[in-house]
Amino acid sequence: MSDESAREVDKQLRLRVCVLSELQKTERDYVGTLEFLVSAFLHRMNQCAAAKVDKNVTEETVKMLFSNIEEILIVHKEFLKVVEECLYPEPSAQQEVGACFLHFKDKFRIYDEYCSNHEKAQKLLLELNKIRTIRTFLLNCMLLGGRKNTDVPLEGYLVTPIQRICKYPLLLKELLKRTPRRHSDYTAVMEALQAMKAVCSNINEAKRQMEKLEVLEEWQAHIEGWEGSNITDTCTEMLMCGVLMKISSGNIQERVFFLFDNLLVYCKRKHRRLKNSKASTDGYRYVFRGRINTEVMEVENVDDGTADFHSSGHIVVNGWKIHNTAKNKWFVCMAKSPEEKHEWFEAILKERERRKGLKLGMEQDTWVMISEQGEKLYKMMCKQGNLIKDRKRKLTTFPKCFLGSEFVSWLLEIGEIHRPEEGVHLGQALLENGIIHHVTDKHQFKPEQMLYRFRYDDGTFYPRSEMQDVISKGVRLYCRLHSLFTPVVRDKDYHLRTYKSVVMANKLIDWLIAQGDCRTREEAMIFAVGLCDNGFMHHVLEKSEFKDEPLLFRFFADEEMEGSNMKHRLMKHDLKVVENVIAKSLLIKSNEGSYGFGLEDKNKVPIIKLVEKGSNAEMAGMEVGKKIFAINGDLVFLRPFPEVDCFLKSCLNSRKPLRVLVSTKPRETVKIPDSADGLGFQIRGFGPSVVHAVGRGTVAAAAGLHPGQCIIKVNGINVSKETHASVIAHVTACRKYKRPMKQDSIQWVYDSLESAQEDIQKSHSKPPGDGAGDAFECKVEDVIDKFNTMAIIDGKKEHVSLTVDNVHLEYGVVYEYDSTAGTKCNVVEKMVEPKGFFSLTAKILEALAKSDEHFVQNCTSLNSLNEVIATDLQSKFTSMCSERIEHVCHRISSYGRFSRVLKNRAWPTFKQAKPKISPLHSSDFCPTNCHVNVMEVSYPKTSTSLGSAFGVQLDSRKHNSHDKENKSVEPGKLSPMVYIQHTITTMAAPSGLSLGHKDGHGLQYLLKEEDLETQDIYHKLLGKLQTALKEVEMSVCQIDDLLSSITYSPKLERKTTECVTPMDSDNEKGERNSKRVCFNVAGDEQEDSGHDTVSNRDSYSDCNSNRNSIASFTSICSSQCSSYFHSDEMDSGDELPISVRISHDKQDKIHTCLEQLFSQIDSIINLLKGQAVIRAFEQTKYLTPGRGLQEFQQEMEAKLSCPRRLRLHLKQDPWNLPSSIQALAQSIRKHAEEVKCRILLALLEYSDSETQLRRDMVFCQSLVATVCAFSEQLMAALNQMFDNSKENEMETCEASRRWLDQIANAGVLFHFQSLLSPNLKDEQAMLEDTLVALFDLEKVSFFFKPSEEDPLVANVPLTYQVEGSRQALKVYFYMDSYHFEQLPQRLKNGGGFKIHPVLFSQALESMEGYCYRDNISVEEFQAQINTASLEKVKQYNQKLRAFYLDKSNSPPNTTSKAAYIDKLMKPLNALDELYRLITSFIRSKRIAACVNTPCSASGVGLLSVSSELCDRLGACHIIMCSSGVHRCTLSVTLEQTITLARSHGLPPRYIMQAMDVMRKQGARVQNTAKNLGVRDRTPQSAPRLYKLCEPPPPVGEE
C-alpha cells in the first residue's frame, strides 16, 4: 500500500471514530431527553389526571399527547446499553456497531404508533396551550425538570423521537462512508443502513422528516470546505436561495446565499475548468465562505443611492446590510431587482417571526408563572413562622431570610416537589426572575447553608412588567436629559478625539442621584446597566460595560441622528414611510345584510367596484374607482384581497358600522348627467357657493357629488367669487325647464344637521304653491335654491360639469417599523379638522345669549328697589341699570348674529391663524388652528408586545407585513390584530387679543380671583333663591288645595268630580281607623303622594326637620274642632259639613306638606343669612344708606320665625291657617326678592361689557376644542380602540370599557399643555386668558342621548346640543344606537359628568430673570399654575382610587375581586414617581439659590412628564402655542414618538429618527402649508428635543 493510500485510510478511520463518538453522545442525550419527558411531564400529568385537579387533563389527554413514549424509552435504554458495550471503553476505529442496529431493527417498529399519533398530539397541545392554567402547569413541569423552557418548548421535545429515528440513516450513511470495505463492520453497517431506511419508510411522518433531512444533507455534500456543525443538526428546511452581490472589506463579489431556519450560509460558485477533474467527480458545486446564526443576525435596509462606510464608498442599489452581532462584523448585500430584494426581506421576516414569536410568548408566560408561584410560596413561608426570620452570620444579622437547604426540605415536605433537584431548579428560577436573591448577591441558588431573601422584604422586587418598566423609565430619562437648557449630554473631547452627544458614566450617576431618581450610586448603576441591556445606550467604543467610572457612553438614539462618521452607526431610517394619504373618513351602516358597495382587487389594492343606488354607502360618499386605505382601523390596502373580503364579512356579521378611510383629492371634477328627474342637489351661499344637499339615489349622488363641497367651476367657468344667482344661472344655462314636479319624493342628505333642520322647518312652514319665493334673498345664510330642474337634452351638453373642492380632508401618512417584539407595526398618522366645528360654536353662543336674556328678564324686578333707595340716588340708579342692561342686550343681539353666520359658514372648514389682529368677528369665538392629531397603531396580536430592543429592520414596504400573494387564507379566519388609537388636539391658546387692552394683559390680570369666585357665588345664589321660591309657591298651593276642601259636602263632591269618595267598604274601614277632624279632602287629592314636587335643594338641605313642630297637628286639630263644634258661640246659621272625617293617609299628607314648607323656608332663611348676601349688601349700601344689612336681618327675624308662629296659629286658630301660610309666603318672597335685586345690582356692576365679551370669547374657544378632543377619544373608546397604557396587559376592549366607566363616575380629565413664553406680552396675555377659560370650563357637564335612526347628515357620528347658563352649561352628545348602547348604564340613563381641566405651562426657553408683576417672577408664575394643576390631578386620582375600591364595582368573588382591584390599581400605583418628578421640577424653578446646581437643571422636562402622568389617568390632551402650528407640531410629534416607544415597541434607538421623519414628512406638514403667513416663534434656545433635527454640517464646517 502506498503512503498516500495509507494516509487516506488513516484519515477515514479517524473520521469513523468521530462518527461513532457522535452516535454515542447523541444517543445519551436522546435517552436523557426521553427521561426528562417521562419524569417531568408524563408522570406529573398522570398524577394530575388521577387527582382530577383540572378537567382538561384526563388520562385520554395524556395518552394522546405522549402515546407510547415510555416504551420507546425502555427500548432506547437497552439500545444505549448495547452501543456503549460495543464502544467500551471509548470509541475506536476497529469497533463494530452495525450489529446493534440489526439486533434492534424490529424493536424500532415501536415508532410507528408514536409517529402516526404525532399530528394529533401537536393539535391537542396547541389547544391546551390556549388554556392559561394548562400552560402554567406545563411551564412549571419544565421548570422543575431543570430545563430552560424558552430554548425548546414542549412541542420541540415531542417531535424529538421522530427526528431521532430519522437521524439514524444519516448517521449510518456517514459511518458507511468512513468505513473501509475491508473493515469487519462494513457489511453490517450497510445492512443496518438499509434496515433503518426501511423502518423510516414505513412511518409516514418519519419518511417526510427523513426526506427533508436527506435533501439538506445532499445539499451540504455539494459544498467544498464546509465548516461547523452539519446543516441537519440545526436546520430542517431551506427558505430562500439566490445570487447576491456582497460588499465587504472594500471588495464586491458575487456570492450564493442560502437561508435556512436558524442559519444563513453564503458560498462562492465553483467553476469547473475540466470535465474530468476531481472536482467534477466529487460533485462540489460551491465553495464555503461563511455562515451566520440568524439568532445573532440583524438586517438593516439601505436606501438606494447610499454610499457609506460599510459599502466602502460603493453606491448601493436594491441593497441591505447584514450585521453579525456575535462577531460585530458587517457586510452589504445587493439584489438584482427591488422584487428580489423584497423576497429576501419577506423570507428573513418569516424566519425571524417563526423563531422569536413563540420564544417571546413563553418568556412572558414563564415570568407570570414564576411571579405567581413566588408570591404563593412567600405567603406560605410567612405563615410557617420559622422559615423566614432574622439570622446571624459572621457577626452580621441578616433580617428576614431563609436557608437554601431548609427551603428545599420544606418544598419536599409540602409536596410541591418530588425530588431535591427539582427544588434546586425552582429556587434558581425564582432567583433568575428576581423573586429571591442571595443576601449579598454573590451566589446562585444552592441547597446549602446559604442565606437567601425574598425581594418583597427588602424593597428590591420589580413589578411583573419589569421590561416595560425599564422601557418607560428609559424613554422618560432620555426625554428629560434632552430637555435641559444646560445639556448633560454634549460633545466631549477625549484622548485627542471629539465624541458627539456623549455623557460620562459617573456624571450620569451624579445626575440621577441629584434628581432623586436613585438613592445610591449602586442603584443608579443597576438602572444604567438596564438601559444598556435594553438598547438605550452603549459605550462609544463598545469596549466596556457600564461602570461608575469616567467612561463615555452614548444613547443609540443620538447616534442615529449624528452624521455618520461613526463606525458602528446603524441604518438611517427605521420608521419608514409606506404611503402618503389624502383621504376622507366615511361612516357606513349595514342595511339588510349589506353595506351597499363592492370591492375588486386591482394591482393588489382594494378598489371600489360598485356602489348601490340609494344605499348608505352612496349616502356616505363612496365612489367607484376610489382606493380604500383602511376599514375600522385595519389597513386593508396592505392585506391580500381574500383577507379583505373575509374581514368585511366578519364586520357585517357583527353588525358594526364601517369606518372607511377612502382616497380622494383636494379638488375634483364631477360630471352630472342630465336627467328627467332633475340634477338632485341644492346649493347655498356664494364666494364660493356650497353644495347644501344631495338627494339619495339621484344622478348627482351617483356622479360623486357630496354635501359640503365648494363649487369652484361650472362647465369650466370659474364661479368661486360669483354671486349665488350667477352660479345658479351657470348651472341651469343649458336647461329648458325650471323645475321638476317630483321634489317631495327625494330624500335629502345635508351638509350639516342645522341646515337639515332649517330646511325641514321651511318646507313645513311654507304654504302650498309658494315654491319659488325664497330662492334669491339678500342674506347669504338664507339663500337656498332647489333646482332639481327637469332636463331635456338640447344636443349641446349632456351633463353639468362641476369642479369642486372637497372638505374635511384627512392628510395622513402610513408608517411601519419592526417592534422590539419582532412584529411588524403599522402606524397611521392623521391631522383631522373637527366636524361640526362652527355649528358647535354657534350653539354655545346661543346658550350664552339665552343666559343673558334670562338675566335681563330678572333685571326687570330691579324697580322694586326704588322704595329702599334714597330719592337723590334714584336717577343715578336708573341710568346705571339701563346703561348696563343695554350693554347686555347689545351682546345678546351680537351673539345671535354671530350664531347665524357660524351656522352657515362652510368654507374654510377650520379657523386659520391671523398674522394681524382684525376687528371682532364671529370666528373669534372659534379656536384657532384646532386640529385633532390621530395616531392609529395596528400589529398582529401576540402573547406579548415586549422583546429585545434590538430588532430586525425591514424595508419591504406595504406588503412585507403579510405573507406572499400565494398564501391562502383559511375561510372565515383572520389572524387577530391589535388596533389602538391615540389622539392629541392642537390649537392656538384661547385669546381675546382681537379686543385689545391698553395694558396688554389678559383676563386673569383684569379679573381678580376673588371677583371671579364672587360672581360665581352670586349666580349660584340667584339660582338657588329662584328655585327655592318656586318650591315654596308649589307647597303653598298644595296646602291651599288641601285646606280648600274643608266643609265641602260629599254630594257636591260627587257632582264636581267623577270619583270623589272611596267605595263603601273603604269608607267603613276609614271610619274605623280615623279621627274626627275639621277637614274633608277630595278623592282626587288622595292619589297625590305629597312628594310630587321635585326638590333641588341639595345646597341647603342640611336644615333641621320641622316634624317636631307639627307632630301633634292631628290631635290639635281634633281637639280644636271638637271644642268648636260644641261651643255656644257657634252661629246657628253656620252650616256644618255632613262628613268631617279624615283618614290617616290624608293626615299624613298634610303633615308632609307642612314639613316640606317649613324646611323650604328654613333653607331660604339660611341662604339669606349667608356670606354672599352680606357681600351683596356691602356692595350696594351706597345706594341705600337708610337700609343696611342689620335692618334687613332684624326685619327678617321678626317676620320669618315660622316654626314658632305657625305652631301658635295651629293651637289658637287652625281655621286661619291658610291665611297665615299665605302671609308667611309673601313675607319670605318679599325678603328674597330684595336680596335677588341686590345680587342683580352687584352683578351689573361686575358686568363690564368688554371684559365679559372677552371672557365668553376665550371660554367658547376652549370649550369647542374640549368637545372636539373628547369626541375623538370617546369614539375611539366606543370603537374599542382606546388604550392609554399597553403595559397593563389589558385588552383594548377592556381598556376602552374601563375608561368609559371611569369618566361616567369620576368625570373626564383634560390635560392642557401650554408652550407659551410668558416673557412676551401677547403670549402672557394668552396664558392669562387661558387660565380664566379653564376656570369657566369647570362648570361644564357632558350628557348623552341617542340620535334619530335615519340621519340626515352623512359621516357625522356625533352631533351636539348646548343648554344651560354660564354657571352650569350642559353639552349633549347625540349618537347612533349602536354606539349609545356601549355607554355605561349611568350615562344611558341620563346621567352626566363634570370635566376636570388642568393646565401645565412651560416655555421652551429659560424664563430666568423675567418679571411677571408685583415682584413675582415669570418662573414663579408658571410654578403657581403647575402647582395648582398638580393638586387637581391628585384629587382626580383620589376619585379614581375611590371608584376602583368601591366594592359594588368589582366581582362578587373575593379572590377575583382582589385580582380585579389589583389590576385596576396597578397603573395608578405607578404614578408616585411621576408626582415626585413634577414636584421637583416645580420646586427647582422656585428655589433661586439652586439655580446653578444640578437639582435646578430640569429644563422643560415638566412637559413630557406631566403629559405621561395625565395619559396614565386617561386624560384627553390639548397642546397650545401662540398659533397652533410650529411649537404644537414639535410637541405632538414628541408625544407620539414617546407613545410608540413606551407602549408599542418602537426600538428606543430610533426615537430621534422617528421624530425627525414624522416632523418633516408627517401629516403636520400640511398644517404649516395651511398657515403660510404665520411666523415661527419657537425660541432659538429651545432644548434639542424640541428642535427640528437638522442634517449635520459638512466636514470642516463644524
From Swiss-Prot:
Q: Which residues form the PH domain?
A: 237-353
Ranges where the record places region Disordered: 1573-1598
- PROSITE patterns with a match to the protein in the record: DEP, DH_1, DH_2, PDZ, PH_DOMAIN
Q: Which GO terms describe its biological process?
A: adult locomotory behavior; dendrite morphogenesis; G protein-coupled receptor signaling pathway; phosphatidylinositol 3-kinase/protein kinase B signal transduction
Against InterPro entries, the record matches this protein to: DBL_dom_sf, DEP_dom, DH_dom, GDS_CDC24_CS, mTOR-Rac_regulators, PDZ, PDZ_sf, PH-like_dom_sf
What Pfam family does this protein match (any one)?
DEP
Q: List cellular component terms (GO).
A: plasma membrane
Residues of the signal peptide: none
Which Gene3D superfamilies does the UniProt entry name for this protein? 2.30.42.10, Dbl homology (DH) domain, Pleckstrin-homology domain (PH domain)/Phosphotyrosine-binding domain (PTB), Winged helix-like DNA-binding domain superfamily/Winged helix DNA-binding domain
Q: Which CDD domains match?
A: DEP_1_P-Rex, DEP_2_P-Rex, PDZ_RGS12-like, PH_Collybistin_ASEF, RhoGEF
Q: For the DEP domain, which residue ranges apply?
A: 382-456, 483-558
GO-annotated molecular function: GTPase activator activity; guanyl-nucleotide exchange factor activity
SUPFAM superfamilies found in the cross-reference section = DBL homology domain (DH-domain), PDZ domain-like, PH domain-like, Winged helix' DNA-binding domain
Q: Which residues form the PDZ domain?
A: 584-663, 669-746
Which segments constitute the DH domain? 15-206
Q: Which UniProt keywords apply?
A: Guanine-nucleotide releasing factor, Repeat
Q: What does this protein do?
A: Functions as a RAC1 guanine nucleotide exchange factor (GEF), activating Rac proteins by exchanging bound GDP for free GTP. Its activity is synergistically activated by phosphatidylinositol 3,4,5-trisphosphate and the beta gamma subunits of heterotrimeric G protein. Mediates the activation of RAC1 in a PI3K-dependent manner. May be an important mediator of Rac signaling, acting directly downstream of both G protein-coupled receptors and phosphoinositide 3-kinase.
Q: Which PANTHER family match?
A: DEP DOMAIN PROTEIN, PHOSPHATIDYLINOSITOL 3,4,5-TRISPHOSPHATE-DEPENDENT RAC EXCHANGER 2 PROTEIN
Q: How does it assemble?
A: Interacts with RAC1.
Question: What does the entry's free-text domain comment contain?
Answer: PH domain confers substrate specificity and recognition. Able to discriminate between RAC1, RHOA, and CDC42.
- The protein, known as: Phosphatidylinositol 3,4,5-trisphosphate-dependent Rac exchanger 2 protein
Q: Corresponding gene?
A: Prex2
